[in-house]
From Swiss-Prot:
<feature type="active site" description="Proton acceptor">
    <location>
        <position position="347"/>
    </location>
</feature>
<dbReference type="GO" id="GO:0006635">
    <property type="term" value="P:fatty acid beta-oxidation"/>
</dbReference>
<dbReference type="GO" id="GO:0010124">
    <property type="term" value="P:phenylacetate catabolic process"/>
</dbReference>
<feature type="active site" description="Proton acceptor">
    <location>
        <position position="377"/>
    </location>
</feature>
<keyword id="KW-0276">Fatty acid metabolism</keyword>
<protein>
    <recommendedName>
        <fullName>3-ketoacyl-CoA thiolase</fullName>
        <ecNumber>2.3.1.16</ecNumber>
    </recommendedName>
</protein>
<comment type="subunit">
    <text>Heterotetramer of two alpha chains (FadB) and two beta chains (FadA).</text>
</comment>
<dbReference type="InterPro" id="IPR020617">
    <property type="entry name" value="Thiolase_C"/>
</dbReference>
<dbReference type="InterPro" id="IPR016039">
    <property type="entry name" value="Thiolase-like"/>
</dbReference>
<comment type="pathway">
    <text>Lipid metabolism; fatty acid beta-oxidation.</text>
</comment>
<dbReference type="InterPro" id="IPR050215">
    <property type="entry name" value="Thiolase-like_sf_Thiolase"/>
</dbReference>
<dbReference type="Pfam" id="PF00108">
    <property type="entry name" value="Thiolase_N"/>
</dbReference>
<keyword id="KW-0808">Transferase</keyword>
<feature type="active site" description="Acyl-thioester intermediate">
    <location>
        <position position="95"/>
    </location>
</feature>
<comment type="function">
    <text>Catalyzes the final step of fatty acid oxidation in which acetyl-CoA is released and the CoA ester of a fatty acid two carbons shorter is formed.</text>
</comment>
<dbReference type="InterPro" id="IPR002155">
    <property type="entry name" value="Thiolase"/>
</dbReference>
<keyword id="KW-0963">Cytoplasm</keyword>
Length: 391
């Protein structure tokens, strides 16, 4: 396809290996260092991109405190080849933060407010826990269900509303680990994982070029033996069918179609459309349905036009209703999360949006797809979606 000058193109994508938050590979690596390493290495392998041209570094991060505080985007960019004259901002849309970072850069490019951006996100959930420093307003219970801030219970609700069984969830969990392991063994993650130094379980320093979160030994029988994690009386959501708590970062180089053509760069993809949407916080995981419907409408497409989908696996009980109502549940094995998802790889909040988008682009490249959708739910009831076309 030919590019228009203000088209938004993805030049390259990279991510860290996903590390377990409890005693994992990144336990002695700070979030800013992880981010800076990733940005530097991605720029290094794209030598046609001059770091001086970067307009803004836009970095997703949810818990912006401790080492992730004081605008981690700037903290990280100062330790990269990007000059001090380039700007940096940290954004949060909870789980969708780094996809929002992509959308912010895209909107700037579309309106002529910059040509080259570095976007991505990070979350070191081992160093900055999910609830660190959080003080929810009790008055929120006057406006939304009291359990709306408890993600596992919202997944229980959504699964129950849509008749999703425990066995369906367990099968989905096994699938995630099996596909992620298969992708690892077959080298499907090779282009997206930027190797990083870390510490193994014995405390030895080594270079990791794989995700330590994947459990290839996962079986249906093993998952069936797990107790409910959130609702002990009659619950169906377990640790084995929930996204893992992990540490990681993701990064993309994004630019205008005109600048890519000027530099002689062959992009991975162009953004066709973007959308966000809100839903009842009590069923926060349903957000990808309205946001995807909105994004497809803006692109003049239907779900039947889409070759591949990356849906963030917050919970199996959440993902399955979304796939059902997007009318792709029966096409799951052909189109959806072909390299596994967050149940196997984890969900470092600020990282995940760019991570699933980049993984989608690699799936499209490896399988010859033209159109793809990356979408995810967002805590407290939102969805965010990006439609990509491979160039």
């Amino acid at each position: 396809m030919s590019l228009n000058p203000r088209d938004v193109v993805i030049v390259d994508f990279g991510r860290t290996p996903m590390g377990r938050s409890k005693g994992g590979m990144h336990r002695n690596t700070r979030a800013e260092d992880m981010s800076a390493h990733l940005i530097s290495k991605l720029l290094e392998r794209n030598d046609k991109v001059d770091p001086k041209e970067v307009e803004d570094v836009i970095w997703g991060c949810v818990n912006q405190t401790l080492e992730q505080g004081w605008n981690i985007a700037r903290m990280a960019s100062l330790m990269t080849p990007i000059p001090h004259t380039s700007a940096a901002q940290t954004v949060s849309r909870l789980c969708g933060s780094s996809m929002s970072a992509l959308h912010t850069a895209a909107q700037a490019i579309m309106t002529g407010n910059g040509d080259v951006f570095v976007i991505g996100g990070v979350e070191h959930m081992g160093h900055v826990s999910m609830m660190h420093g959080v003080d929810p307003n009790p008055h929120l219970s006057l406006h939304a269900a009291k359990a709306s801030g408890m993600m596992g219970l919202t997944a229980e609700m959504l699964g129950k509303m849509h008749g999703i069984t425990r066995e369906q969830q367990d099968l989905f969990g096994v699938r995630s680990h099996q596909l992620a392991h298969k992708a690892t063994v077959e080298g499907k993650f090779k282009d997206e994982i930027i190797p990083m130094q870390g510490y193994d379980e014995n405390g030895f320093l080594k270079v990791f070029d794989f995700d330590e979160t994947i459990r290839p030994e996962t079986t249906l029988e093993g998952l069936a033996s797990l107790k409910p994690a959130f609702n002990p009386k009659g619950g169906t959501v377990t640790a084995g069918t929930s996204s893992q708590i992990t540490d990681g970062a993701s990064c993309m180089i994004v630019m205008s179609g005109q600048r890519a053509m000027d530099l002689g760069i062959q992009p991975l993809a162009v953004i066709r459309s973007m959308a966000v949407a809100g839903v009842d916080p009590a069923i926060m995981g349903y957000g990808p349905v309205p946001s995807t419907q909105k994004a497809l409408k803006r692109a003049g497409l239907t779900m039947a036009d889409i070759d591949f989908i990356e849906l963030n696996e917050a919970f199996a009980a959440q993902a399955l209703p979304v796939l059902k109502d997007l009318k792709v549940l029966d096409k799951m094995d052909e189109k959806v999360n072909l390299h596994g998802g967050a149940i196997a790889l984890g969900h470092p909040f600020g990282c995940s949006g760019a991570r699933i988008s980049g993984t989608l682009l690699n799936v499209m490249k490896q399988n010859g797809g033209t159109l793809g959708v990356a979408t995810m739910c967002v805590g407290l009831g939102q969805g965010i979606t990006t439609v990509f076309e491979r160039v």
